[in-house]
């Protein structure tokens, strides 16, 4: 192990290398701490919303202790829903940074409520939150470049290259240097991530997959750095070329691909669905009540044999046209979700060629912060909203009195964290690309000449 101590001394003797490694360790630690702090803040928000909503419901119960048909309690009572962060969410914020993880809904039309909490600010969403995924995808390659760009040119400029190449087993020397430097970068990423995973209660399989993705991503960039560093250029030229490659692969090409996807697979924002549903609801006031009820009962025959509408206002008509408003945009909602999933599928395919995109998609999947996780939360909200509607419809359409005791019978939402293992194809593609580029770089390094 003397060679290891010797190579470590060489690295630590270089103030630039030592400072770079310490900086990466610090940045990763801050990113992990920031992610843990954010997920804890979200859990505290979720813990507060239930007692606050219970107090709100108690206020409604005092205001409407009894109702002849449950209309007023149905209209004024809110129900909290929440999407708790997974144990791995501290690693990658993903869509949790722009999509609500807490949403209160009523028995009224769902679509108008589902998207009114949507946040869309492209200037803020572009860079993303400073988390482990950000450090790995955008910053870690820069440290690989800093440690490997002068691997050969530095020895040439110092006049030692000819001597090193003349040594027996010289190829092993270069491989050891590359491996040690990459291992140190990996350690600066892995150590804070492991500590954060233990603090967050993350399972071992998920952590192992995250570390594998990090290792493969670093291997890709090590291969790229070697392909450039072995071309015989000066250190400055190597660094400039590698910085250009980094900008193209991590910033330019993903941005251009995103613009292309936006044009090829156009998808409206969720707020457009909200506006369409609200227009349908507002227009229902101009439609004869009997016509509205006929249309509603045709789609919900289980309420067909209930009492007819009285001549005065009745809440069941009001809730009926809210439900019809949701149904009027059902095709648009389906097209919206299908469009989002098509974009997601193309993004995953793009990750087969751009390792940064592929690694980020895998991390978001493990963390449960990607698009499928957000849509799964919306599905849970929709299923719960149907339970709430069905609960109140029993009072509204049967003219059954709603008393103080009935407030305790209300449905209760059960939140659960999202998160799943990524597809085998995504991990395999990243592995194949990383190992291919690394093998090409090591091959050139093994054929190094003065």
Segments (PLM) and residue ranges:
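Secretory targeting signals
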Residues: 28-38, 123-131, 142, 176-235, ...
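Membrane-helix interface segments
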Residues: 16, 170, 207, 235-238
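Long, hydrophobic alpha-helical segments
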Residues: 127-154, 158
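Residue-level signature of transmembrane alpha-helical entry/exit and packing/kink sites
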Residues: 2, 20, 134, 138, ...
